A protein has these predicted regions:
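Glycine-rich oxoanion-binding loops at beta->alpha junctions
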Residues: 60-77, 262-278, 301-337, 343, ...
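Acidic/histidine-rich
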Residues: 146-180, 448, 453-479, 521
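Generic C-terminus detector
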Residues: 533, 546, 559-600
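Glycine-rich, anion-gripping cofactor-binding loops and their flanking helix/strand elements
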Residues: 173-195, 319-353, 492-526, 559-573, ...
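Conserved short alpha-helical segments that host acidic/polar catalytic motifs at enzyme active sites
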Residues: 1-238, 242-243, 251-285, 418, ...
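Active-site phosphate/pyrophosphate-binding segments
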Residues: 252-256, 260-287, 356, 377-506, ...
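Glycine-rich phosphate-binding loops that contact phosphosugars or nucleotide phosphates
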Residues: 281-430, 510-554, 575
Length: 600
């Protein structure tokens, strides 16, 4: 911030708006009478606020950061900002050649005080400043030496109206105020201060002064257009809910309904997509890629697209995809899924696909994000800000978008008659009401949670399009309750996982009635015969058939198998939530996790 009022309160508020991303320490630095002063704290922002209350930081120019540890433990000494008497730095990303640079700088007399890769940036700039370079000369010279991904903001002693930022592989934006200027990794942090945003492109650096921002790339001045952000500065609260996760689960009927209202023509019951710069009928194949829950949504989308649209589809974990260097056929479509639109591995997969000549479509919840801006077209999940680290409404929104997209592809390719597309669309249109019905069944799931909370290991099983929901259920349980859980395709049970089953291991089956039900029921019989505690998530027909072997049954509304993965995602979220609450974990910000993973 280069402000008119004290910077520290603005920085602290901005960090609060980024709190959802996950972090383990935080800090702020400002210029006080031309000197750099810092306040840092381990743990939550409340600790930093207490440090600022005890020792206030004046000054109208400053930088702030919430850190998710990569190099060095989450301690006060390793918290950002890092720096020297001449320069302070905050950094998202990883400096891959920090060890070589550190050795070189120590040999030149620079004295390091932390274990972090970020301090290398500060020491490199400091070394150049000591040799007589100006900040505007030292910063780009340092950036040219860095390898890896980064978004950087630098504060210089004696320069009260100067910030320098740089971006490579991690997001950074400039905000324009009234005789104030801002730098931020997320437009949401700047939303209360400005609606005028300019995004740095990969490899850019920027000199920010009180009323101007000068952008540079490859040593030359460039222009970067201001855009009006659609993000609001309104505070995001939990309302009457205990946690953001609980609130966001209960928002799912409305989110799904809003998406269907946007993506389905009310008169014809046909899917409607925004204008696309490529012809879906001529796409030769698709490659879906994402991380975490988004990858499980991609797996579900693969099932839908192949089975009803008859198009070859691959679904890949983004962090593995580009390192395989897969050959990609002409006229292919890459579909990238990311809630934040900033996931580093997914962005890298996008760039690989684009370099291979693929058309690029992204499914994102932030239409101004890096992934969205790098795409030819986007499908916006319009779920609104998701604050809890564990994805709920963004996940079911991704599924809903992919389901409608699959129907649109099927229609474009003539893979299904309109009558069948209308029938499947009708099944999707039942989701908002049936999702609300599932959420109203909270007491039954809470009772089940008391049993699951005692387990050390849990298995989730699913088949077909519900196999990824088993994976998602296991992920949800492990990430917020810290119980070891694994998801498997039900048919794979006898190929290894059955060795784990005994009376202490709950086996949770995502098992709606339909064409695949009997096969999954046979797998559950195998588990029950070995003492497994069978927990069935099914509709009234399926639940009745499995009641004899089930230790517990969660009965869901009957729904067409096409729409079942979206509906069945909700009770597995609810179960994980209640188990986590019973175990007393930090539901919204579980240990070691970050919401937006901007490092590879």
């Amino acid at each position: 911030v280069i402000g008119k009022a004290e910077a520290a309160p603005l920085l602290l508020d901005g960090l609060r708006r980024l709190e959802y991303r996950g972090y383990d320490s935080a800090g702020i630095a400002t210029l006080v009478n031309g000197r750099i002063e810092r306040r840092r704290a381990e743990g939550k922002l409340v600790n930093l606020a207490a440090a600022l209350a005890a020792r206030p930081l004046p000054g109208v120019t400053g930088i702030g950061h919430t850190r998710w540890a990569t190099h060095g433990a989450p301690t006060i000494s390793n918290a950002h900002p890092h720096g020297t008497a001449r320069v302070a730095v905050v950094h998202n990303g990883i400096i891959e050649n920090h060890a070589e640079l550190r050795a070189e700088l120590e040999a030149a007399g620079q004295v390091f005080s932390t274990e972090t890769d970020t301090e290398t940036v500060a020491q490199l700039v400091d070394h150049l400043l000591k040799q007589g370079a100006s900040p505007e000369e030292a910063a780009p010279a340092a950036f040219a030496r860095l390898e890896g991904a980064y978004a950087l903001a630098l504060l210089f002693a004696g320069h009260s109206e100067l910030l320098i930022g740089a971006q490579r592989g991690a997001p950074l934006a400039v905000g324009y105020g009234d005789a104030e200027m801002y730098l931020g990794s997320d437009a949401l942090a700047m939303a209360p201060l400005t609606q005028q945003i300019a995004y740095l492109e990969d490899g850019d650096w920027v000199v920010v002064r009180r009323e101007t921002a000068s952008f540079f790339a490859a040593g030359a001045a460039v222009s970067r257009a201001k855009k009006v952000t659609s993000l609001t500065g309104a505070a995001i609260g939990k309302g009457n809910f205990r946690h953001f996760m609980e609130k966001e689960m209960h928002e799912q009927p409305v989110v799904i309904g809003d998406l269907l209202h946007r993506m389905v023509d009310a008169a014809s019951q046909m899917p409607v997509l925004p204008a696309l710069p490529f012809d879906l009928a001529k796409i030769s194949h698709m490659t879906l890629s994402a991380c975490g829950s988004g990858y499980y949504a991609a797996l579900t989308g693969k099932f839908w697209l192949e089975s009803i649209s008859r198009v070859p589809v691959e679904a890949d974990v983004a962090s593995e995809f580009r390192y395989r260097a897969p050959p990609m056929r002409e006229n292919g479509l890459g579909v990238l899924l990311s809630q934040s639109g900033e996931t580093a591995d997914t962005l890298a997969a996008l760039r690989y696909m684009a370099a291979q000549g693929q058309n690029i479509l992204s499914v994102v919840n932030v239409p101004e994000s890096s992934i969205a801006r790098a795409s030819e077209a986007i499908l916006d999940t319009i779920a609104g800000p998701e604050i809890s680290v564990a994805s709920t409404k963004a996940f079911t929104a991704q599924l809903t978008v992919l389901a409608v997209f699959a129907l649109a592809v099927a229609r474009a390719r003539g893979a299904l008659p309109d009558t069948e597309i209308a029938r499947l669309t009708d099944a999707l249109l039942e989701l908002p009401a049936k999702a609300a019905e599932v959420l109203a069944n909270d007491g039954t799931i809470h009772a089940l949670a008391a049993r699951i909370a005692e387990a050390r290991d849990v298995l989730y099983l699913g088949r077909g399009a519900c196999y990824p929901i088993a994976l998602e259920g296991a992920l949800k349980l492990k990430e917020i309750s810290y119980i070891h859980a694994e998801g498997y395709a039900a048919g794979e049970l006898k190929h290894g996982p059955i060795a784990l089953i005994d009376k202490a291991v709950p086996v949770i089956a995502i098992c709606p009635s339909g064409p695949l039900f009997e096969k999954t029921a046979s797998n559950l019989q195998e588990a029950a015969a070995r003492g497994g505690q069978i927990v069935v998530f099914s509709d009234p027909v399926g639940a009745a058939k499995l009641r004899a072997i089930a230790a517990a049954t969660i009965v869901l509304p009957k729904i067409d198998p096409f729409a079942a993965p979206i509906l069945y995602a909700i009770p597995v979220q609810m179960l994980a939530y209640h188990v986590a609450v019973l175990k007393g974990t930090d539901v919204d910000q579980p240990r070691n996790l970050a919401k937006s993973v901007t490092v590879e």
